[in-house]
Amino acid sequence: MMLELRKIGVLPRDEDLDYPVDEVRGLFDAHGLDVSFLEADAAPADLDLVVALGGDGTVLRAFDRFPGCPVLAINFGTVGFLTAGDRKDLAQIVQLLVDGRYVVSERLVLLCRYPGGEDLVYNEVTLRARHKLLFTDVFVDDAKIRTIRGDGVVVGTPTGSTGLLMSMGA
């Protein structure tokens, strides 16, 4: 799938950190692409692409703030499992993007419904009970698959299960 790249938003991990703003803007401007830097509390905009400058936390924040919008992640953070490359690769990544030499990876998400609301889940959802037995009904596509009895349940996406296993040292 080729993206139409008219409006690109850049979402930095932390506005107070030293980002090469001029370099990033220059790389996109050199190819005639309209790029704007997004503030942390800015309302979601109509964008064709979000470029997340940070680690996996920034990527997840971009998914949450701009649902359905493709996210290109450049690792400026600590954990870069979901990123296309590191800060040093920025010029090459922009060139590959402009040349159309990329693959869009679709990520599976979960819809978690709970009393009082629902949320999209990109990694995993954890339900825990302290000091008591928990009975949890698990549904897939509105069909109950089982009731789980225990002190907790973790349900993860393929992306989230990898992160969860890595955090456990596996």
Describe every region a protein language model picked out:
Residues 79-152:
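Catalytic core of DAGKc-family lipid kinases
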Residues 1-49, 53, 65, 87-103, ...:
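ATP/NTP phosphate-donor binding region
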Residues 57-62, 161-167:
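Short glycine/serine/threonine-rich phosphate/pyrophosphate-binding segments
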Residues 12-13, 74-76:
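Cofactor-binding loop segments of dinucleotide-utilizing enzymes, especially the Rossmann-like FAD-
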Residues 53-73, 79, 83-87:
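Glycine-rich phosphate/dinucleotide-binding loop and adjoining beta-alpha-beta core of small-molecule
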Residues 50, 71, 153-154:
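Short, well-ordered beta-strand core segments
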Residues 148, 155-162:
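Conserved binding/recognition cores within well-folded domains
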